Amino acid sequence: MLLGSHVSMSGKKMLEGSAEEAHKFGESTFMIYTGAPQNTRRKSIEDLNIEKGHEAMDKYGLSNLVVHAPYIINIANTTKPEVFQLGVDFLQNEIERTQALGAKDIVLHPGSHVGAGADKGIQQIIKGLNEVLTHDNDVRIALETMAGKGSEVGRTFEEIAQIIDGVTHNDRLSICFDTCHTHDAGYNIKEDFDGVLNEFDKIIGLDRIKVVHVNDSKNEQGAHKDRHENIGFGHIGFDALNYVVHHDVFKDIPKILETPYVGEDKKNKKPPYKFEIEMLKAQQFDSELKDKILQQ
């Protein structure tokens, strides 16, 4: 089963360190940012330690590496041309790094229309993606399903379909299906996941889903908030998320946990992934999981 989490990539080891961290958590796949998600500072491709990283991945049986684009990219912005242009240029740069890392998909939040309205935002995203996807490259941009917080675009399957339909080289667009986001956007992940998948299939097509983000939610269905919770401790619940993780449709697709670190002490929070992965593999909810995470 391809199950992993977001892991860090830093220091001298970079990708090799990411693979070691993923292995420590008992993962078979993992997701990274190529640098800090909130800024444009990046090490050169030569400094990402890619060769040793791939050796470590082979050694630990890790595959289907996923890259996440930084949050600062907003190609839906129509009010500030410089923000749009930075997004286009930086996304192009990130795609080159994704290719060098050997990942097939880079996950992208479609963007926020910052008050101009969803239709204008969608047109701007299409314009940006058409600029980016002219370069010869076989990395896919995985548009993420969004919660609809603020002016986020991509809160409905229809909005995402509109983007895909407008992009010329849309064979290079895939989808990252986020359980927390779709729940927060109003879809019934908890009680009717197959119904949600059927709707997605009709509007976009299940074959587009290449990454799944597995997160519980701190909010009720339709809250449009986007606050992740540990598996089984939120409003989606363990049974529904366990069903998602073991679903036949996602058998060969990397499933990535982005659940929060646990603990009150901000300087000493503990990663939950090893414990959540063990629990999902056992298919049995553990109500004492957070205590076990804290005791590690």
Swiss-Prot record:
The keyword Protein biosynthesis does not apply. It catalyses: Endonucleolytic cleavage to 5'-phosphooligonucleotide end-products. Its EC number is 3.1.21.2. The keyword DNA repair applies. It is an enzyme of class 3 (hydrolase). Its cofactor is Zn(2+). Binds 3 Zn(2+) ions. Zn(2+) 1 binds at H68, H109, E144. Disulfide bonds: none annotated. Zn(2+) 2 binds at E144, D178, H213, E258. Keywords: DNA damage, DNA repair, Endonuclease, Hydrolase, Metal-binding, Nuclease, Zinc. One of its GO terms (biological process) is base-excision repair. SUPFAM superfamilies: Xylose isomerase-like (SSF51658). Zn(2+) 3 binds at H181, D226, H228. InterPro entries: AP_endonuc_2, AP_endonuc_F2_Zn_BS, Xyl_isomerase-like_sf, Xyl_isomerase-like_TIM-brl. One of its GO terms (molecular function) is phosphoric diester hydrolase activity. Belongs to the AP endonuclease 2 family. Endonuclease IV plays a role in DNA repair. It cleaves phosphodiester bonds at apurinic or apyrimidinic (AP) sites, generating a 3'-hydroxyl group and a 5'-terminal sugar phosphate. This is Probable endonuclease 4.
